[in-house]
């Protein structure tokens, strides 16, 4: 959303609790984005958490803590984008004999079956990543299984994407995950400068 508001003329400050932006992606693909937004935005604050926000006559005063310093800044508007809160525990799945997990997700197997073998679930309610194209693929798998076909869902086959400028996308294990799991891998690199969308 910061990209959209910046394009519309807003001044932007990004606050990220992790040590880099888009922590789910490998650092080598987020570095070009970080470099670009750091030049465009007022600030990109990493390893920083918001300690509070107070409406004042001058705007919204926000407190930040980096572990080293505590400070405040005043903004016209604040957009909080910390993820999604799932409402799977409010679907009434228990009435069908399905118990959501501790985070509210409906547990499913690779065929998208719930704990009740005749009931299937797909989409955000079954877990990460919460992406429309992931849900569509899960739905296809469920339909094929219901039709008697052999099918299984593999979340690693689903691309992740950040609609930023430059756009970032990845699929499969990240390089960091492959290293951590001791999996041999090959890495391909395509320079941003060669992209027609830069």
Place the predicted regions along the sequence by residue.
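Structured beta-strand/loop patches that form or line metal/cofactor-binding pockets in enzymes
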Residues: 54, 169-198
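A structural micro-motif
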Residues: 10, 42, 60, 98, ...
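Conserved beta-strand termini and adjacent loop/short-helix elements that scaffold enzyme active sites
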Residues: 47-49, 103, 188-190
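FAD-site-proximal beta/loop scaffold in flavoenzymes
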Residues: 73-146, 153
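Short, solvent-exposed coil/turn elements at secondary-structure transition points
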Residues: 50, 56, 112, 125, ...
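Rossmann-like dinucleotide-binding cores of NAD(P)H-dependent redox enzymes
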Residues: 1-71, 129-136, 144-177
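Glycine-rich phosphate/pyrophosphate-binding beta-alpha loops
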Residues: 124-131, 164, 192-197
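Hydrophobic/aromatic beta-strand patches that form the interior of the parallel beta-sheet core
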Residues: 13-15, 45, 79, 120-122, ...
């Amino acid at each position: 959303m910061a990209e959209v508001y910046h394009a519309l003329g807003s001044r932007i400050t990004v606050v990220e609790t992790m040590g880099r932006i888009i922590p789910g992606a490998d650092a080598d693909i987020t570095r070009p984005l970080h470099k670009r937004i750091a030049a465009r935005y007022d600030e990109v604050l990493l390893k920083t958490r918001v300690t509070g926000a107070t409406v004042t006559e001058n705007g919204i005063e926000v407190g930040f803590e980096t572990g080293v310093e505590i400070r405040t800044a005043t903004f016209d508007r604040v957009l909080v984008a910390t993820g999604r809160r799932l409402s799977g525990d409010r679907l009434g799945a228990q009435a069908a004999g399905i118990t959501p997990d501790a985070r509210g997700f409906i547990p499913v197997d690779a065929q998208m079956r719930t704990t009740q073998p005749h009931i299937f679930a797909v989409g955000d309610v079954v877990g990460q990543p919460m992406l429309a194209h992931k849900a569509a693929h899960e739905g296809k798998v469920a339909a094929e299984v219901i039709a008697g076909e052999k099918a299984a869902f593999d979340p690693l086959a689903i691309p992740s994407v950040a609609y930023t400028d430059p756009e970032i996308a990845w699929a499969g294990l990240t390089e960091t995950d492959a290293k951590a799991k001791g999996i041999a891998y090959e890495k391909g690199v395509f320079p941003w400068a060669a992209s027609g969308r830069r």
